[in-house]
A protein has these predicted regions:
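N-proximal low-complexity "stem/linker" segments adjacent to membrane-targeting elements
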Residues: 1-28
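Cell-envelope/extracellular polymer assembly enzymes that use nucleotide-activated donors
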Residues: 4-7, 37, 189
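A conserved acidic beta->alpha catalytic loop
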Residues: 25, 42-51, 69, 92-96
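Short aromatic/hydrophobic "clamp" motif used to bind/position activated sugar donors
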Residues: 88
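Conserved donor NDP-sugar-binding/catalytic core segment of glycosyltransferases
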Residues: 100-134, 212
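A recurrent flexible, glycine/aromatic-enriched loop bordering the glycosyltransferase active site
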Residues: 147-170, 183, 189
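Active-site-adjacent helix/loop segment of glycosyltransferases
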Residues: 208-295
Length: 330
């Protein structure tokens, strides 16, 4: 690798307080300071982030870039274009890196023996109380990390989340970076193109980022549907294997999830009313101390909205049922 091994790229939008924690953590990395730089791209922030960055960017190894709001993919591309390091490490503005995060990403690439894209865990901070749907997200991610560590799952493009990820700068440039037309799931879409270019994937278990995530209920609900539509778009863009995977996974879902999906899918009002009823139930159970039980309700909500997004992208309820349900039950 070059003298400057790593360029850390942090896209940010109106998260000034937690961004300050991210920047402080990057100042305390165990990787020698002369081996990496940090580039922060403010994507149209209006909360004082730009002023914070102006005070922070006091050396050549601290770059602050400001741009009109264009989305996280465009912000990451701008940071990558300004980067000098051989390895790009992407860290989101609400992911506080552990002290050894950069050391572990760098070591994983050197161990790989081939060109790879790496991703590390984003874990729930122990000192933060988050909304129950966000805690469900963390619990779901932790299950996937356990499956990777145990060997039940292999690292794959579907698990590549750019909140804590690393890619050789040359490979990133070769595939054209992030698709700036996408505001959701732009990271997995990039990962599919990296895989097509011959990159492998590696899970960097020790490169821990503490994810100070918080999102509104409306945002969480919208994201689930958007991911379903995104997956169909990716299939049509040249990844037919993904559609086979989605179909194969459907029968493995909880029977209750499948039953509710088959009643609601393709019916927007039914999806909305069912989602809100289950969210209310999940909140009630969570407040009563039944967090693990409440996760079941949030899991059903996420899945019915995801499959609704799939159905809408495919052409509606009938197409979905004919494709996913034996006999096309309506």
């Amino acid at each position: 690798m070059s003298a400057l091994d790593v360029s850390v790229v942090v896209p940010t939008y109106n998260r000034r307080a937690v961004l300050a924690r991210v920047l402080d953590a990057l100042e305390h990395q165990t990787l020698d300071a002369d081996r990496f730089e940090v580039i922060v791209v403010s994507d149209g922030s209006t909360d004082g982030t730009d002023q914070l960055l102006a005070r922070w960017a006091t050396s050549p190894r601290r770059q602050a870039i400001t741009q009109a709001n264009a989305g996280p993919g465009a912000a990451r591309n701008a940071g990558a274009a300004a980067a000098a390091g051989s390895l790009l490490v992407f860290v989101d503005d609400d992911v506080v890196p552990s002290p050894d995060l950069l050391v572990h990403h760098l070591a994983a690439h050197r161990r790989a023996g081939r060109s790879v894209a790496g991703f590390g865990p984003m874990l729930k901070p122990v000192d933060v109380r988050q909304s129950p749907w966000v805690r469900w997200e963390h619990a779901t991610l932790e299950k996937s990390y356990d499956a990777l560590v145990s060997g039940r799952w292999d690292p794959s493009p579907r698990l590549f989340y750019s909140g804590n990820a690393s890619v050789p700068a040359s490979a990133f440039a070769a595939v054209g970076g992030f698709d700036v037309t996408r505001r959701r799931a732009e990271d997995t879409e990039l990962a599919y193109r990296l895989a097509d270019a011959g990159l492998g994937f590696t899970y960097v278990h020790d490169a821990v980022g503490w994810h100070h995530a918080e999102r509104s209920l409306a945002s969480w609900l919208a994201i689930a549907s958007a991911y379903g539509g995104h997956d169909v778009e990716v299939v049509r863009a040249g990844q037919p294997w993904l559609f086979d995977a989605i179909i194969e996974e459907y029968p493995t879902r909880n029977p209750v999830t499948r039953a509710v999906t088959q009643v609601t899918v393709g019916r927007s009002r039914a999806v909305h009313l069912t989602s809100m009823a289950l969210v209310s139930l999940g909140r009630l159970i969570d407040r009563a101390g039944g967090e693990r039980i409440a996760r079941g309700a949030f899991s059903i909500v996420h899945n019915i909205r995801y499959y609704h997004g799939v159905a809408e992208a495919l052409g509606g309820r009938r197409v979905f049922l004919d494709t996913f349900v034996p006999g096309g039950r309506r």
